[in-house]
Amino acid sequence: MGILTKILLAIFVISSFTFIALFGRLPAFRRTPIGYLSRLFCDRIPRWLYRVDYRLFGGRISKALGHLGHYLFFKRNPVVMLIFLTILTGSSFMFLRAGYTRLSALQLFPVPFVLLAPYLFTYLCATNRSMYITPANHDDRLHDYPYDHILYRPNAVCKTCHLSKPARSKHCSLCGHCVAKCDHHCPWVNNCLGKDNYHYFLALLLSLGVLEIYGANLAWSIIRPMINWNFNTIGINCFHLIWWAKMTAVTVDAAHRGGISITGVGLLAATTAPLPLGLLAYHIYLIWAGMTTNENQKWSYWREDMADGTVFRARRSDVLAHNELMRNQISTNQLEGGHLQKRVSYLNDESEQGEPDVDWPVSSDQMIVRTNDGRPPLGREYLYERIWDLTQVENIYDLGFVDNLRDVFLPR
């Protein structure tokens, strides 16, 4: 196996596993080969290995790996971030040491800025703690966003933090805190991404993509004069087998002349650049849609339930008026019945009691519920209509792309 084959194979394996690890669990890939590979690598193969270990070694290896896996995947730790920074630092050092003297001053001028930017934004993402919800800032976080009464409802209490959950927040078991406007926990920065550091994460993705593209371009500028890159003389294009044979020969020649430090790093940069840029494009889509990663997953569950015909919509003001009327009609002696007691408790859950008054440009009177039997809530059938698609639901957090961007980069 030649050096080119080894480089390409290593890059392909790293890129493929990274892509599957990052995107395999997304709802969009649930019924695709990527989702299947994610379940294969993360669920089925580990279960098969556990059975083999249990029969041969009594499960001792699985137990030891389980403790290690619990630390790596269920405890906040810097392992993934250190691997990421090690690859970034090692690749940059190898390339600059071998190619520094072959680059012009104009090419070298942007290097300090392009190279240091990912380190800066990684630091800002990893060290920011202001999005953690604590008793000291809890009241302020309650007034960040209004409750939409779909994904977020008032008076819900975190069982771990023992604080009422602000709208758009989520508890992170790895960080041990509820996180304001939680997007997701990112092992690459060993921290949750939320209200006050999400924009740094976007900058990290952009800076990393720019670094890889620029690094690949520098590697190509060094290798280009060393190889015979003349495809026009044979009058072919990439749809001919001859073109691919020529490309293979050129790549092999480049690998031998540039070595791992230049050709290898350049290929690694060129082939992995789509990963951060693709993830950045996905997050730009989320911003355009007025969602976080956490909310996108929640909406996907609602979408599936709507397709099953088990979701109903009503005007919240009508439901509250109906509940108030029911409470007024039920006398004290009737409350002693178990069924009516449950009904009154349910009515109280739907009240607006304790909901903070939030200054937000969009408001909605909608309320949606899901039922197990596919029928509207008992006794209130006339208030609810069945809905089949998310287009029938208003997302109050979507203010339009420009205002959504402003909310990300200039949070209130």
Q: What is the role of each PLM region?
A:
Residues 1-171, 182-185, 189-412:
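Membrane-associated feature with strongest affinity for ZDHHC
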